[in-house]
Curated annotation (Swiss-Prot):
Keywords: ATP-binding, Carbohydrate metabolism, Kinase, Magnesium, Metal-binding, Multifunctional enzyme, Nucleotide-binding, Serine/threonine-protein kinase, Transferase. Its cofactor is Mg(2+). Pfam families: Hpr_kinase_C, Hpr_kinase_N. This is HPr kinase/phosphorylase.
Amino acid sequence: MLTARALVNKFNLQLVAGEEGLDRPIHNTDISRPGLEMAGYFSHYASDRIQLLGTTELSFYNLLPDEERHGRLRKLCRPDTPAIIVTRDIEPPEELVVAAKELGTPLLTSKDATTSLMSRLTTYLEHELAKTTSLHGVLVDVYGVGVLITGDSGIGKSETALELVKRGHRLVADDNVEIREITKDELIGKPPKLIEHLLEIRGLGIINVMTLFGAGSILTEKKIGLNINLENWDKNKLYDRVGLNEETLRILDTEITKKTIPVRPGRNVAVIIEVAAMNYRLNIMGINTAEEFNERLNAEILRKNEHKEENES
Protein backbone atom coordinates (compact mmCIF):
# COMPACT_ATOMS: atom_id res chain seq x y z
CA MET A 1 0.00 0.00 0.00
CA LEU A 2 1.39 3.38 -1.04
CA THR A 3 1.14 6.17 1.54
CA ALA A 4 2.21 9.79 1.98
CA ARG A 5 5.04 8.58 4.19
CA ALA A 6 6.67 6.97 1.15
CA LEU A 7 6.51 10.31 -0.69
CA VAL A 8 8.31 12.07 2.17
CA ASN A 9 11.25 9.69 1.85
CA LYS A 10 11.25 9.48 -1.95
CA PHE A 11 11.02 13.21 -2.75
CA ASN A 12 12.77 14.67 0.31
CA LEU A 13 9.65 16.47 1.53
CA GLN A 14 9.41 18.28 4.86
CA LEU A 15 6.52 17.56 7.21
CA VAL A 16 4.83 20.68 8.60
CA ALA A 17 1.64 19.27 10.15
CA GLY A 18 -0.70 16.27 10.14
CA GLU A 19 1.81 13.56 10.99
CA GLU A 20 -0.98 11.20 12.07
CA GLY A 21 -2.24 11.13 8.48
CA LEU A 22 1.03 10.02 6.87
CA ASP A 23 -0.23 6.46 6.57
CA ARG A 24 -3.32 7.39 4.56
CA PRO A 25 -3.43 5.25 1.42
CA ILE A 26 -2.92 6.78 -2.02
CA HIS A 27 -5.19 5.24 -4.67
CA ASN A 28 -5.27 7.91 -7.40
CA THR A 29 -2.41 8.58 -9.82
CA ASP A 30 -3.78 12.02 -10.71
CA ILE A 31 -2.56 15.17 -8.95
CA SER A 32 -4.62 18.33 -8.44
CA ARG A 33 -3.68 21.99 -8.36
CA PRO A 34 -6.80 23.34 -6.61
CA GLY A 35 -7.16 26.69 -8.36
CA LEU A 36 -10.97 26.64 -8.67
CA GLU A 37 -11.22 25.45 -5.08
CA MET A 38 -9.21 28.47 -3.96
CA ALA A 39 -11.90 30.57 -5.63
CA GLY A 40 -14.56 28.75 -3.60
CA TYR A 41 -15.81 26.15 -6.11
CA PHE A 42 -15.81 22.74 -4.40
CA SER A 43 -18.64 21.01 -6.30
CA HIS A 44 -16.22 18.68 -8.12
CA TYR A 45 -13.29 18.75 -5.70
CA ALA A 46 -11.13 15.64 -6.26
CA SER A 47 -10.32 15.17 -2.60
CA ASP A 48 -8.76 11.72 -3.08
CA ARG A 49 -5.86 13.20 -5.04
CA ILE A 50 -2.62 14.72 -3.77
CA GLN A 51 -3.10 18.51 -3.71
CA LEU A 52 -0.26 20.68 -4.99
CA LEU A 53 -0.10 24.36 -4.02
CA GLY A 54 2.33 26.60 -5.89
CA THR A 55 2.92 30.30 -6.39
CA THR A 56 -0.24 30.78 -8.49
CA GLU A 57 -2.63 29.20 -5.97
CA LEU A 58 -1.13 30.86 -2.91
CA SER A 59 -0.83 34.31 -4.49
CA PHE A 60 -4.56 34.14 -5.26
CA TYR A 61 -5.25 32.95 -1.73
CA ASN A 62 -3.44 35.99 -0.33
CA LEU A 63 -5.93 38.24 -2.16
CA LEU A 64 -8.91 36.70 -0.34
CA PRO A 65 -10.65 38.60 2.47
CA ASP A 66 -9.57 37.51 5.95
CA GLU A 67 -13.00 36.05 6.78
CA GLU A 68 -12.80 33.60 3.82
CA ARG A 69 -9.26 32.33 4.25
CA HIS A 70 -9.59 29.80 7.06
CA GLY A 71 -12.76 28.17 5.75
CA ARG A 72 -11.36 27.95 2.22
CA LEU A 73 -8.26 26.02 3.24
CA ARG A 74 -10.14 23.90 5.76
CA LYS A 75 -12.27 22.53 2.92
CA LEU A 76 -9.11 21.25 1.22
CA CYS A 77 -8.36 18.96 4.17
CA ARG A 78 -10.68 15.98 3.72
CA PRO A 79 -10.43 12.56 5.41
CA ASP A 80 -9.48 10.93 2.08
CA THR A 81 -6.95 13.58 1.02
CA PRO A 82 -3.55 11.80 0.99
CA ALA A 83 -1.45 14.96 1.35
CA ILE A 84 -1.19 18.67 0.58
CA ILE A 85 2.20 19.75 -0.75
CA VAL A 86 3.38 23.37 -0.88
CA THR A 87 6.13 23.81 -3.48
CA ARG A 88 9.03 26.23 -4.14
CA ASP A 89 9.91 26.25 -0.42
CA ILE A 90 7.02 28.68 0.20
CA GLU A 91 5.97 28.95 3.82
CA PRO A 92 2.45 27.49 4.16
CA PRO A 93 -0.26 29.91 5.32
CA GLU A 94 -0.95 29.70 9.05
CA GLU A 95 -4.60 28.91 8.35
CA LEU A 96 -3.54 25.82 6.36
CA VAL A 97 -1.20 24.65 9.11
CA VAL A 98 -3.99 24.93 11.69
CA ALA A 99 -6.50 23.09 9.47
CA ALA A 100 -4.01 20.30 8.71
CA LYS A 101 -3.30 19.81 12.42
CA GLU A 102 -6.97 19.74 13.37
CA LEU A 103 -8.05 17.37 10.59
CA GLY A 104 -4.94 15.18 10.44
CA THR A 105 -4.15 15.87 6.79
CA PRO A 106 -0.41 15.65 6.01
CA LEU A 107 0.94 19.08 5.07
CA LEU A 108 4.30 18.87 3.31
CA THR A 109 6.69 21.33 1.69
CA SER A 110 9.12 20.91 -1.19
CA LYS A 111 11.94 23.03 -2.60
CA ASP A 112 11.14 21.91 -6.15
CA ALA A 113 9.25 23.94 -8.74
CA THR A 114 5.57 23.02 -8.97
CA THR A 115 5.61 21.72 -12.56
CA SER A 116 8.78 19.70 -12.00
CA LEU A 117 7.49 18.07 -8.81
CA MET A 118 4.12 17.35 -10.41
CA SER A 119 5.78 15.57 -13.33
CA ARG A 120 8.00 13.46 -11.07
CA LEU A 121 5.12 12.61 -8.74
CA THR A 122 2.91 11.54 -11.65
CA THR A 123 5.59 9.23 -13.06
CA TYR A 124 6.21 7.71 -9.62
CA LEU A 125 2.51 7.19 -8.86
CA GLU A 126 1.82 5.63 -12.27
CA HIS A 127 4.64 3.17 -11.65
CA GLU A 128 3.71 2.31 -8.06
CA LEU A 129 -0.07 2.15 -8.58
CA ALA A 130 0.00 0.38 -11.94
CA LYS A 131 -2.06 -2.77 -12.45
CA THR A 132 0.11 -5.84 -12.03
CA THR A 133 0.12 -9.49 -13.01
CA SER A 134 2.65 -12.29 -13.39
CA LEU A 135 3.22 -14.72 -16.24
CA HIS A 136 5.12 -17.97 -16.60
CA GLY A 137 7.84 -17.30 -19.13
CA VAL A 138 11.23 -15.73 -19.78
CA LEU A 139 11.89 -12.05 -20.55
CA VAL A 140 15.01 -11.17 -22.56
CA ASP A 141 16.24 -7.91 -24.07
CA VAL A 142 17.08 -8.75 -27.70
CA TYR A 143 18.46 -5.87 -29.78
CA GLY A 144 16.62 -3.42 -27.53
CA VAL A 145 13.28 -5.24 -27.82
CA GLY A 146 11.74 -6.78 -24.72
CA VAL A 147 10.94 -10.34 -25.86
CA LEU A 148 8.62 -12.40 -23.65
CA ILE A 149 9.23 -16.09 -24.38
CA THR A 150 6.29 -18.32 -23.42
CA GLY A 151 5.34 -21.95 -23.93
CA ASP A 152 4.63 -25.18 -22.11
CA SER A 153 6.91 -26.29 -19.31
CA GLY A 154 9.95 -28.14 -20.68
CA ILE A 155 9.70 -26.66 -24.19
CA GLY A 156 13.13 -25.02 -23.84
CA LYS A 157 12.45 -21.41 -22.82
CA SER A 158 15.32 -21.14 -20.34
CA GLU A 159 17.76 -22.95 -22.65
CA THR A 160 16.85 -20.51 -25.43
CA ALA A 161 17.37 -17.58 -23.05
CA LEU A 162 20.81 -18.97 -22.13
CA GLU A 163 21.77 -19.16 -25.79
CA LEU A 164 20.59 -15.57 -26.30
CA VAL A 165 22.66 -14.38 -23.32
CA LYS A 166 25.72 -16.16 -24.77
CA ARG A 167 25.08 -14.27 -28.02
CA GLY A 168 25.29 -10.93 -26.18
CA HIS A 169 21.67 -10.25 -25.23
CA ARG A 170 20.42 -9.54 -21.71
CA LEU A 171 18.29 -11.58 -19.34
CA VAL A 172 15.55 -9.80 -17.40
CA ALA A 173 13.55 -12.62 -15.78
CA ASP A 174 13.31 -16.39 -15.92
CA ASP A 175 10.36 -18.64 -15.03
CA ASN A 176 8.18 -15.89 -13.49
CA VAL A 177 7.81 -12.40 -14.95
CA GLU A 178 6.16 -9.66 -12.87
CA ILE A 179 4.39 -7.25 -15.21
CA ARG A 180 3.15 -3.71 -14.55
CA GLU A 181 0.90 -1.80 -16.92
CA ILE A 182 2.40 1.66 -16.44
CA THR A 183 0.20 3.34 -19.05
CA LYS A 184 -2.00 2.14 -21.87
CA ASP A 185 0.15 0.08 -24.27
CA GLU A 186 3.18 0.09 -21.96
CA LEU A 187 4.04 -3.10 -20.07
CA ILE A 188 7.13 -3.27 -17.88
CA GLY A 189 8.46 -6.69 -16.89
CA LYS A 190 10.83 -7.48 -14.04
CA PRO A 191 11.85 -10.55 -12.02
CA PRO A 192 10.75 -11.35 -8.47
CA LYS A 193 13.54 -10.40 -6.06
CA LEU A 194 13.99 -14.03 -5.02
CA ILE A 195 15.04 -15.19 -8.51
CA GLU A 196 16.67 -12.02 -9.83
CA HIS A 197 19.61 -12.78 -12.22
CA LEU A 198 18.95 -16.53 -11.91
CA LEU A 199 18.31 -19.02 -14.70
CA GLU A 200 17.14 -22.62 -14.25
CA ILE A 201 18.51 -25.18 -16.70
CA ARG A 202 17.16 -28.73 -16.44
CA GLY A 203 19.97 -31.18 -15.76
CA LEU A 204 22.32 -28.38 -14.72
CA GLY A 205 20.40 -26.57 -12.01
CA ILE A 206 20.21 -22.88 -11.14
CA ILE A 207 22.91 -20.58 -12.48
CA ASN A 208 23.63 -16.92 -11.73
CA VAL A 209 23.77 -15.17 -15.10
CA MET A 210 25.41 -12.00 -13.76
CA THR A 211 28.18 -13.99 -12.04
CA LEU A 212 28.87 -16.12 -15.12
CA PHE A 213 28.51 -13.54 -17.90
CA GLY A 214 28.97 -10.19 -16.14
CA ALA A 215 26.78 -7.20 -15.28
CA GLY A 216 26.19 -6.46 -18.96
CA SER A 217 24.22 -9.68 -19.36
CA ILE A 218 21.27 -8.70 -17.15
CA LEU A 219 18.62 -5.98 -16.83
CA THR A 220 16.45 -5.20 -13.80
CA GLU A 221 13.37 -4.38 -15.91
CA LYS A 222 12.34 -3.98 -19.54
CA LYS A 223 9.39 -2.76 -21.59
CA ILE A 224 7.71 -5.76 -23.26
CA GLY A 225 7.21 -5.40 -27.01
CA LEU A 226 7.06 -8.89 -28.50
CA ASN A 227 5.79 -12.31 -27.41
CA ILE A 228 7.44 -15.44 -28.81
CA ASN A 229 5.35 -18.52 -28.02
CA LEU A 230 7.22 -21.82 -28.38
CA GLU A 231 5.28 -25.00 -29.13
CA ASN A 232 6.11 -28.52 -30.26
CA TRP A 233 5.98 -28.93 -34.02
CA ASP A 234 2.58 -30.24 -35.13
CA LYS A 235 2.73 -31.67 -38.66
CA ASN A 236 -1.05 -31.33 -38.97
CA LYS A 237 -1.01 -27.62 -38.19
CA LEU A 238 -0.53 -24.92 -40.81
CA TYR A 239 2.06 -22.41 -39.61
CA ASP A 240 2.43 -18.90 -40.99
CA ARG A 241 5.13 -19.03 -43.70
CA VAL A 242 4.77 -15.50 -45.05
CA GLY A 243 4.20 -13.31 -42.00
CA LEU A 244 0.85 -11.79 -42.94
CA ASN A 245 -1.08 -13.37 -40.08
CA GLU A 246 -0.93 -11.01 -37.11
CA GLU A 247 -1.43 -12.58 -33.69
CA THR A 248 -1.59 -10.66 -30.43
CA LEU A 249 -1.29 -11.53 -26.76
CA ARG A 250 -3.44 -9.57 -24.30
CA ILE A 251 -1.82 -8.79 -20.95
CA LEU A 252 -4.03 -6.75 -18.61
CA ASP A 253 -5.48 -4.10 -20.97
CA THR A 254 -2.60 -4.08 -23.45
CA GLU A 255 -2.10 -6.17 -26.58
CA ILE A 256 1.39 -7.00 -27.85
CA THR A 257 2.57 -8.68 -31.05
CA LYS A 258 2.72 -12.47 -30.80
CA LYS A 259 4.69 -14.93 -32.95
CA THR A 260 4.27 -18.70 -32.65
CA ILE A 261 7.50 -20.63 -33.27
CA PRO A 262 7.25 -24.42 -33.74
CA VAL A 263 10.14 -26.26 -32.09
CA ARG A 264 11.78 -29.43 -33.43
CA PRO A 265 15.34 -30.80 -33.62
CA GLY A 266 17.58 -28.82 -35.94
CA ARG A 267 15.85 -25.46 -35.52
CA ASN A 268 18.01 -22.78 -33.92
CA VAL A 269 15.34 -21.03 -31.87
CA ALA A 270 17.69 -18.36 -30.50
CA VAL A 271 18.60 -17.19 -34.02
CA ILE A 272 14.93 -17.18 -35.03
CA ILE A 273 14.11 -14.98 -32.01
CA GLU A 274 16.94 -12.60 -32.94
CA VAL A 275 15.52 -12.24 -36.44
CA ALA A 276 11.99 -11.83 -35.04
CA ALA A 277 13.19 -8.98 -32.81
CA MET A 278 14.96 -7.23 -35.70
CA ASN A 279 11.91 -7.70 -37.93
CA TYR A 280 9.70 -6.28 -35.16
CA ARG A 281 11.87 -3.15 -35.09
CA LEU A 282 11.57 -2.84 -38.87
CA ASN A 283 7.78 -3.10 -38.60
CA ILE A 284 7.75 -0.27 -36.06
CA MET A 285 9.74 1.81 -38.56
CA GLY A 286 7.07 1.10 -41.18
CA ILE A 287 8.95 -1.59 -43.12
CA ASN A 288 6.93 -4.79 -43.54
CA THR A 289 8.68 -7.40 -45.68
CA ALA A 290 5.66 -9.72 -45.77
CA GLU A 291 3.39 -6.98 -47.12
CA GLU A 292 6.00 -5.93 -49.68
CA PHE A 293 6.32 -9.54 -50.88
CA ASN A 294 2.53 -9.87 -51.06
CA GLU A 295 2.30 -6.69 -53.16
CA ARG A 296 5.02 -7.94 -55.54
CA LEU A 297 3.29 -11.32 -55.80
CA ASN A 298 -0.08 -9.73 -56.59
CA ALA A 299 1.54 -7.44 -59.15
CA GLU A 300 3.25 -10.42 -60.82
CA ILE A 301 -0.02 -12.39 -60.93
CA LEU A 302 -1.81 -9.39 -62.43
CA ARG A 303 0.94 -8.93 -65.04
CA LYS A 304 0.77 -12.61 -66.09
CA ASN A 305 -3.03 -12.50 -66.33
CA GLU A 306 -2.86 -9.42 -68.55
CA HIS A 307 -0.19 -11.06 -70.72
CA LYS A 308 -2.33 -14.20 -71.02
CA GLU A 309 -5.38 -12.17 -72.08
CA GLU A 310 -3.32 -10.37 -74.74
CA ASN A 311 -2.11 -13.69 -76.21
CA GLU A 312 -5.62 -15.13 -76.28
CA SER A 313 -6.95 -12.08 -78.09
